[in-house]
């Protein structure tokens, strides 16, 4: 299916993306950070779910969900298809940057066959809606090695200049 977003053009296998993404949504992580994301994202960024759905991606089925802090997130969605033309303007949904990376350039740990591209959604700030204190959440996100990896990832992302095909 051909999809246009601003001056970007995509050819996407929506049915395959829906099949994979809905399976991931049914089997997603239940740590506090992820539960907070699933609970807060729709009310905070109401246009994000319909935007991702155009590509067949379920907002609750990211391939990777990275909390940089308890309320700062980046969600990565692998989209089967091709970027036909990269736009000259960055994509924003509800003020959130959406960075598009083609295939293996995205540095995602995946066994999926190409062609695919990755949509990195965020950084997005969400309110903390859970009753537990985020400092008490048991998650890899509280480990120093994870935080160091996320810091490195963020610094690399800043260098992407929000346009990377």
Tell me the role of every PLM-derived stretch.
Residues 32, 80, 120:
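Residues in well-ordered beta-strands of folded domains
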Residues 1-42:
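Long, hydrophobic N-terminal alpha-helical segment
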Residues 27-72:
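Short, well-structured hydrophobic secondary-structure segments
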Residues 48-52, 79, 150:
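Generic structural signal of hydrophobic/aromatic residues within well-ordered alpha-helices
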Residues 59-116:
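Amphipathic protein-protein interaction modules
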Residues 36, 82-86, 124-126:
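Generic structural motif
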Residues 101-165:
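Glycine-rich, aromatic-bearing surface loops/beta-hairpins
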């Amino acid at each position: 299916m051909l999809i246009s977003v601003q001056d970007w053009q995509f050819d996407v296998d929506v049915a395959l993306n829906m099949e994979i993404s809905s399976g991931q949504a049914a089997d997603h992580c239940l740590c506090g950070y992820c539960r907070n994301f699933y609970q807060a994202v729709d009310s905070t960024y109401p246009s994000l779910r319909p935007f991702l759905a155009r590509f067949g991606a379920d907002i609750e089925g990211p391939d990777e969900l990275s909390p940089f802090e308890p309320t700062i997130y980046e969600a990565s969605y692998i989209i089967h298809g091709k970027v036909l033309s990269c736009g000259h303007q960055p994509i924003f949904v509800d003020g959130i940057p959406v960075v598009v990376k083609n295939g293996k350039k995205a540095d995602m740990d995946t066994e999926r066959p190409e062609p695919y591209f990755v949509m990195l959604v965020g950084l997005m700030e969400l309110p903390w809606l859970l009753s537990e204190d985020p400092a008490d959440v048991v998650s890899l996100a509280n480990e120093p090695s994870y935080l160091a990896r996320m810091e490195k990832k963020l610094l690399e992302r800043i260098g992407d200049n929000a346009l990377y095909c």
